[in-house]
Every structure is written in C-alpha cells, then in structure tokens.
UniProtKB/Swiss-Prot annotation:
Taxon lineage: Bacteria, Pseudomonadati, Campylobacterota, Epsilonproteobacteria, Campylobacterales
Key words, A-Z: Metal-binding, Nickel, Zinc
Binding of Ni(2+), residues: H2
Gene giving rise to this polypeptide: hypA
Family matches, as Pfam families: HypA
Role of this protein: Involved in the maturation of [NiFe] hydrogenases. Required for nickel insertion into the metal center of the hydrogenase.
Residues binding Zn(2+): C74, C77, C90, C93
Keyword Ribonucleoprotein belongs to the record: no
UniProt similarity note: Belongs to the HypA/HybF family.
GO MF annotation list: nickel cation binding; zinc ion binding
Protein name (database record): Hydrogenase maturation factor HypA
HAMAP family, sorted: HypA_HybF (MF_00213)
Amino acid sequence: MHELSIVESLIELCEENALNNKAYNVQEIYVKIGRLSGIEVDLFKRCFETFKENSNICKNAKLFIELAPLEILCLKCDQTSILEENVFKCPKCQSIEYKIIQGEDLHLMRLVMK
C-alpha cells in the first residue's frame, strides 16, 4: 500500500506549489498515472480523499486522473509503440531491446489554485 505515501507526497508538493505562488487554496489537481507505475487507482483516490482532509490548502481539491499508456521505443528498429498488453517486445520487429518512454511513473500535470 505505497499509495498512502505517494498521496502524502503529492499533497505536500501541492501545498508547496501553492505557497510558492502565494495561493491559499488548491481547487483542482491533475495527475497522470502510468499503467506500470504499480499504483492502484481506486486505492489512490480513496487515500487522496482521506489525506486531503488534513490539509488546509488542499482540503477542497478535486482530483483528476489520466492513465498513461505504456509506450516503448524499440532500440533495434527505432519504432515507437504503445503496448496494450504486458508483452514486452516490439510489435513491429519482435525485439526485446527497448526503452520505456512513458507508463511507469506518476506525474503532477497541473494545479488550479486560488
């Protein structure tokens, strides 16, 4: 259940951004969660609703989540592909030599503050 610590860090980051921008209220938080991030989205939402109550700045914030697909760059044929299933090879040339471009992380994309 690492979602607890991730949500706690997210709220701290939002509070820090608000203070740095002389805002007193975060209204909307937009995040992008990668398919391979290991984050359970429903649990993440529940943790957010619980933890935001302890924050004066984020207490009324709404959370918006975008799911990022798993995107790879094949190091053999230079093809960029989105993998729909957990088959870790290039769909074009079948190579297993690739670099993950997106889909492993959580990113804070945007804050709406007042």
